């Protein structure tokens, strides 16, 4: 990296934060935890190495420059996701998955972090993975199950969506300001997709499904429910409907 900041002088996020530190030093150091401490049994599951390590760049940025800097960096690297093939590769034939295992993997973790909406617990999960799977070879299923169990949230459909398909889930929603109600559902997703969404302004958790639901929200929550706020924290698309479905 010629002893310079960024990756060969470039900021992979386009946010400016990636030029504050040496990409190679930060990224490769992250592999001491995910790859060297926890290693996958099959390279088809290499997202466990690269997705978590790529997310360490977001955590590093957040630690030194603040939470919004970390959000900026993570949102910025999203532009590098191609979604041409799934992150998980073919098993038993020495076949890695898509190169999206880096940035899409990192955005998946950022998404799950905000769905949990408990940073203390989220960091406990990261440490717990490295403690409980210390110097072991693992499968993605073990990692997925660990996160679901430790977070007390079943993220299986979330992992299936992001690791095993190239679809970006879309949150369809209609805001009825007069009635202080929100109608919402998941679209462009696998059957049974049920990833929770936390309204970060108040901490209220929604549990969308593929069928429309309606909920009462206060003025602060309705005001927060905008494309820019939602997509910044979650790797999803949003579609605000112009009429009540």
Q: Locations of the language-model features?
A:
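Juxtacatalytic substrate-recognition/specificity segment
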Residues: 1-32, 36-46, 56, 91-97
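Acidic/His/Gly-enriched intrinsically disordered linker/tail segments
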Residues: 19, 44-108, 133
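Short, surface-exposed helix-loop/turn micro-motifs enriched in polar/charged residues
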Residues: 21, 40, 44-48, 121-122, ...
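Hydrophobic/aromatic-lined pockets within catalytic cores
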Residues: 30, 34, 38-42, 57-61, ...
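Amphipathic alpha-helical substructures
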Residues: 68, 98-182
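Beta-strand-rich binding/interaction modules
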Residues: 122, 155-156, 175-231
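Edge beta-strands of extracellular beta-sandwich domains
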Residues: 232-245
């Amino acid at each position: 990296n010629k002893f310079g900041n960024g990756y060969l002088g470039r900021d992979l996020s386009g946010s400016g934060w990636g030029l504050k530190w040496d990409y190679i030093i930060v990224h490769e150091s992250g592999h001491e935890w995910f790859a060297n401490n926890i290693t996958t049994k099959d390279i088809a599951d290499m997202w466990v190495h690269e997705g978590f390590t790529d997310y360490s760049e977001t955590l590093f940025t957040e630690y030194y420059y603040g939470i919004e800097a970390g959000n900026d960096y993570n949102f910025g690297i999203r532009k590098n996701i191609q979604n041409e093939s799934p992150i998980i590769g073919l098993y038993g034939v020495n076949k890695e998955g898509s190169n999206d295992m880096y940035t899409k993997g990192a955005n998946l973790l950022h998404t799950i972090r905000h769905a949990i909406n408990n940073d203390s617990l989220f960091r406990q999960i990261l440490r717990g993975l490295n403690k409980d799977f210390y110097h072991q070879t693992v499968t993605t299923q073990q990692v997925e199950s660990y996160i679901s169990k430790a977070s007390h949230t079943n993220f299986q459909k979330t992992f299936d969506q992001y690791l095993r398909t190239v679809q970006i889930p879309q949150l369809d929603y209609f805001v009825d300001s007069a009635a202080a109600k929100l109608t919402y559902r998941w679209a462009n997703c696998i059957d049974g997709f049920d990833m929770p969404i936390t309204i970060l302004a108040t901490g209220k958790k929604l549990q969308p499904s593929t069928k429309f639901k309606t909920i009462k929200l206060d003025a602060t929550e309705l005001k927060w429910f905008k494309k820019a706020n939602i997509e910044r924290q979650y790797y999803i698309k949003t579609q605000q409907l112009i009429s009540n479905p």
